[in-house]
Curated annotation (Swiss-Prot):
Cofactor(s) required, per the database record: pyridoxal 5'-phosphate
Annotated organism of origin: Emericella nidulans (strain FGSC A4 / ATCC 38163 / CBS 112.46 / NRRL 194 / M139) (Aspergillus nidulans)
N6-(pyridoxal phosphate)lysine modified-residue sites: 284
Keyword Hydrolase: yes
Sequence positions that bind pyridoxal 5'-phosphate: 144-145, 172-175, 258, 261, 283, 323, 351
Matching SUPFAM superfamilies: PLP-dependent transferases
Function: Catalyzes the cleavage of L-kynurenine (L-Kyn) and L-3-hydroxykynurenine (L-3OHKyn) into anthranilic acid (AA) and 3-hydroxyanthranilic acid (3-OHAA), respectively.
Pathway annotation: Amino-acid degradation; L-kynurenine degradation; L-alanine and anthranilate from L-kynurenine: step 1/1; Cofactor biosynthesis; NAD(+) biosynthesis; quinolinate from L-kynurenine: step 2/3
Pfam families, alphabetized: Aminotran_5, KYNU_C
Protein name: Kynureninase 2
EC number: 3.7.1.3
Catalytic activity, reaction form: L-kynurenine + H2O = anthranilate + L-alanine + H(+); 3-hydroxy-L-kynurenine + H2O = 3-hydroxyanthranilate + L-alanine + H(+)
Alphabetical keyword list: Cytoplasm, Hydrolase, Pyridine nucleotide biosynthesis, Pyridoxal phosphate
């Protein structure tokens, strides 16, 4: 598609077609024109953007919304605070203060929150739309690694012959530790022999889908499960979840996905893609706050509860159980007969933190006002504009960095990972910090830049590239 707004030739295409920019696209005026034509521009006002002064301060400071804002491209690490968070938190605290324990079951008419005991389901309803699932297949609970442990306990069923887990060569350390510990938990299994790392070719960072399928073929007779990141945290590569899941299933593997960097970033269709299970955090692109409550997905085929053998003999997928996973209709009978909630809710353990769920529901209320497809459309354009400006008037030989994130929009999310030439990382990081630009650096030489469609602008992308070029020239 082509947009012509205010005389500006807009970007073309989203679905696998890289946006194309005109000759004048490298100008500040063009970036401003893109912002003026942005249908999601008003969402920026729903967030508190740290001021340049505050971002440099080492003392507590009240947010100064009218002040000169910093450029915040670190939503892949921690998203910004929604203005709704304070409103929701005030309602939660007032509920607790005014009616105490009755907050568990009482619906306050003028509160944006449901009673505490169903707030996890309130969040699940919103999250299900972001992952392409039925609400019953999703639940808000725990944190990413604890949820991963719970699901590995249910889905990793090694035998003497099928015991291997296939995983990413540069998996986030917590995923690696979780897998390693589950393998070691089973007598006779050695993580060194049962963990298969899938990596790129020498000198490369992108892992082609065909290579993943080939490794599945190579280990199919011995592999029990594959766990990959939806988006690789270091390189920003977005894996072909549908193709990999379907192929792994055809070889008899269970399939799980860590969606830490994919949730609220790219469009997902977990139910349609027949994913067995998935986990994610909510403090990155979902903006629910540092260490906020995570989420998990269990496909409906694994969440069924069968009472054909009697009310006291439900048949269900084995899991590590807790009382909050019990059916609400009988939860308070306290008869020590576990009857799980059908679906993902049956994997809950303890009473959910209403305080954490308050922050999560506040952030999700913003997503309820748009759609992941609309956000993704802008994200593709923002990141393509960033890539365009970074590469303009340079060659592989002249530029002091390499973009190790795939260039195809279908194979990446919001993030671009820049691998700097040796010795540049700290200098560039210091320059960006002094300019009140917040992005993420990863040793030994990567800067991860992630413009978020909810609150970042094309003008900020332009300013970032100007500051980055200045840092290289110093």
């Amino acid at each position: 598609m082509s947009n012509h707004v205010n005389g500006v030739n807009g970007v073309n295409g989203v679905n696998g077609v890289k946006p194309v920019f005109p000759e004048n696209a490298a100008s500040k005026e063009y970036a401003k024109a893109l912002d003026a034509a942005d249908p999601l521009a008003s969402f920026r006002d729903k967030f508190i953007i740290p001021s340049k002064a505050n971002i440099q301060s080492k003392r507590l400071a009240k947010p100064n919304i009218s002040a000169d804002p910093c450029i915040y491209f670190c939503g892949n690490s921690l998203g910004l605070q929604p203005k709704a968070t304070a409103k929701y938190m005030e309602a939660h605290l007032d509920t607790w203060a005014s009616i105490g324990v009755n907050g568990h079951f009482t619906k306050i008419e003028d509160s944006p929150l449901d009673p505490w005991w169903v707030m996890a389901e309130q969040a699940a309803g919103s999250m299900s739309k972001l992952v392409g699932a039925a609400p019953e297949e999703v639940i808000a609970m725990g944190t990413l690694t604890s949820n991963l442990h719970l699901l590995l306990a249910s889905f990793y069923k090694p035998t003497a012959t099928k015991h291997k887990i296939l995983l990413d060569w540069k998996a986030f350390p917590s995923d690696h530790y979780a897998i390693e510990s589950h393998i070691a938990w089973h007598d006779g299994l050695d993580p060194k022999k049962s963990m298969v790392l899938i990596g790129p070719d020498e000198g490369e960072y992108e892992i082609p889908t065909q290579k993943i399928l080939s490794i599945i073929d190579e280990h199919a007779d011995e592999a029990a499960l594959i766990l990959l990141p939806g988006i690789q945290y270091y390189t920003g590569q977005y894996f072909d979840i549908n193709t990999i899941t379907e192929y792994a299933h055809s070889k008899g593997l269970m399939v799980g996905w860590d969606l830490a960097h994919a949730f609220a970033n790219v469009e997902l269709k977990l139910h349609e893609w027949d994913v067995d299970f998935a986990v994610w955090c909510t403090y990155k692109y979902a903006n629910a706050g540092p260490g906020s409550m995570g989420g998990l997905f269990v496909h409906e085929k694994h969440g069924k509860v069968d009472y054909s053998q009697g009310e006291d003999s439900p048949q269900f997928r084995h899991r590590l159980a807790g009382w909050y996973g019990g059916d609400r209709s009988v939860r308070f009978k306290m008869d020590n007969k576990f009857r799980p909630i059908p679906g993902a809710g049956g994997f809950q353990l303890s009473t959910s933190s209403a305080t954490d769920l308050t922050c999560l529901n506040a952030s999700l209320s913003i997503f309820d006002q748009t759609s992941i497809s609309e956000l993704r459309r802008k994200s593709v354009q923002l990141t393509a504009y960033l890539e365009y400006l970074l590469l303009k008037d340079t060659t592989d030989e002249t530029r002091p960095f390499r973009i190790i994130t795939p260039s195809n929009p279908e194979e990446r999310g919001a993030q671009l990972s820049l691998l700097l030439k040796p010795g540049l990382l700290q200098r560039v990081a210091d320059k960006l910090q002094s300019a009140s630009i917040v992005c993420d650096k990863r040793e030994p030489g990567v800067v991860r830049v992630a413009p978020a469609p909810l609150y970042n602008t094309y003008s900020e992308v332009w300013q970032f590239v100007e500051q980055l070029k200045a840092a290289f020239q110093e």
